[in-house]
A protein has these predicted regions:
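Amphipathic coiled-coil signal-relay and dimerization helices
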Residues: 74-76, 119-126, 225-233, 274-275
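Alpha-helical transmembrane segments and their helix-membrane boundary motifs
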Residues: 2-16, 303-309, 323-324
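Cytoplasm-proximal transmembrane signaling helix
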Residues: 284-286, 291-332
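Juxtamembrane extracytoplasmic/periplasmic/luminal helical "stalk" adjacent to the first N-terminal
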Residues: 6-10, 14-88, 103-110, 164-168
Length: 333
């Protein structure tokens, strides 16, 4: 009986010890794993920030080139100063020439338009915009060319397309300090979103084996004061529906803060993330990894220790039963 009691106590002690050791091992291993994940996220965020800056500076140069093109200015003034009934002739030689000039820099734009000083579209590479009203305040950001590279731009939901939008309007002068109208550029935010696209898990640029998968995305507040993606995520359906997003990281970033931490993402999943406010676009860049993925190796290690302890516990219990059975076996005469 004493032998059986010893083996049972040993079994319980082994199981309890392995449980404590596995939990402590898991918790101790989590710290370095979280630090490693954050270090990796900082590198990723810096790279994506640099790519966004490079993309934007390229577009700023293209807009500057357009505004300094004598042919563009000449054709624009011809349209802006024309009589109302002749402005809307989209097949006129002037309109076709202007469209050809602007199309050369169309890569990052949804459209390029000419606006009167009152905000009426009198020319556009998007013919559906003709004669539409595009306010020069609240939504479209009206500014001078030297201000374009660093001025925060308004982010809003386009009432026609329902898509998040950023539009800039730069003056075209008929004389010093005398505006004839504006060149308005509607940016293609999908191209901006492409700058922070994460590599496919099967590509050569994917995170190395053992590293947690990273999700990067850009969000901004619309004119309805709701946070949303700036463009449909990659591989989303054609009729993608933008939904409000909310998390501690999103709120802090859109309030102009940058930092890192542990929080629930918009889907309620625990993540470790780093967030950065991008003042140029009034946008937040977030780089996150699921805690489940980050802690996978420490969880596996803890489970292995617990399983080993459980096996030892069962072995001890089995030994106790075997010894007890042997001691209680009747002695043959």
């Amino acid at each position: 009986m004493k032998n059986r009691s010893f083996w049972i106590k040993l079994s319980v002690a082994t199981l309890a010890s392995s449980s404590v050791i596995s939990l402590v091992t898991y918790l101790l291993a989590n710290g370095p794993l979280a630090a490693k994940a954050l270090a990796n996220q900082r590198t990723v965020l810096q790279d994506k920030q640099a790519r966004i800056e490079q993309w934007w500076q390229g577009e700023v140069r293209d807009i500057g080139t357009d505004l300094q093109n004598p042919k563009l200015v000449e054709n624009s003034l011809t349209i802006l100063q024309a009589k109302r009934h002749s402005r809307a002739d989209i097949n006129s030689a002037t309109s076709l020439a202007l469209e050809a000039i602007l199309t050369s820099h169309q890569t990052n734009r949804n459209s390029a338009s000419l606006l009167t000083k009152g905000g009426i579209v009198v020319f556009s590479t998007d013919h559906d915009k003709y004669a539409a009203y595009q306010p020069l305040k609240n939504t479209t950001t009206s500014l001078e060319l030297p201000e374009l590279a660093s001025t925060p731009l308004n982010f809003f939901t386009n009432s026609s397309t329902g898509l998040p939008s950023i539009s800039v309007a730069l003056p075209i002068y008929i004389a010093p300090k005398k505006k004839a109208g504006f060149l308005a550029i509607d940016l293609d935010l999908r191209k901006l979103n492409n700058q922070i696209a994460d590599p496919d898990t099967n590509s050569k640029k994917a995170p190395p084996s053992g590293s947690a998968a990273i999700k990067s995305y850009l969000v901004a507040r619309t004119s309805l004061d709701q946070a949303t993606f700036i463009a449909p995520p990659a591989q989303s359906p054609p009729e993608y529906e933008f939904k409000p997003l909310d998390s501690v990281g999103i709120r802090k970033a859109l309030d102009g803060n940058s930092g890192e931490g542990f929080y629930l993402n918009s889907e309620g999943v625990p993540v470790i993330g780093i967030y950065q406010y991008l003042p140029n676009f009034r946008t937040a860049l977030l780089v996150e990894s699921r805690q489940k993925d980050i802690y996978a190796s420490s969880r596996t290690m803890g489970l292995q220790i617990f399983e080993a302890g459980a096996l030892l516990s069962l072995f001890s219990l089995g030994m106790g039963l075997l010894v007890d059975r042997k001691n209680n076996h009747p002695i043959e005469s």
